[in-house]
């Protein structure tokens, strides 16, 4: 019974999220530039938003796994990854060294007060959203298991195919 209820809640979350737009929260990137989250986009192509923290081992495993295939994903689909750090102010100085040390080519935004995290309804990290080319949330997922990044690119491919375009 618990599995059925959980499945219904997950499906409801996916259904509801497929119509939502990104909320407007002003964050800073790792270089201090202000960014309004409602204006995040990828030239009409899908993009991935990944909530993480420097101390979250599954988050870092997921972002490392994505980074290993990111160049291929970009070449094939034009997808962009935007990583949102929810590290609090006292740990924010650890984000840039983590990003640089791993060679992550992602756009990285800082959410030290968890304003965007709350606005997006994120309770657990890692949490990933896929946003379609029209700015609508097409998928939402919490947690990471090895190989889970393949599900992300498959969803991106589906969105591109549904729109009838490629990179």
Predicted regions and their residues:
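A short beta-strand-turn-helix
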Residues: 26-46
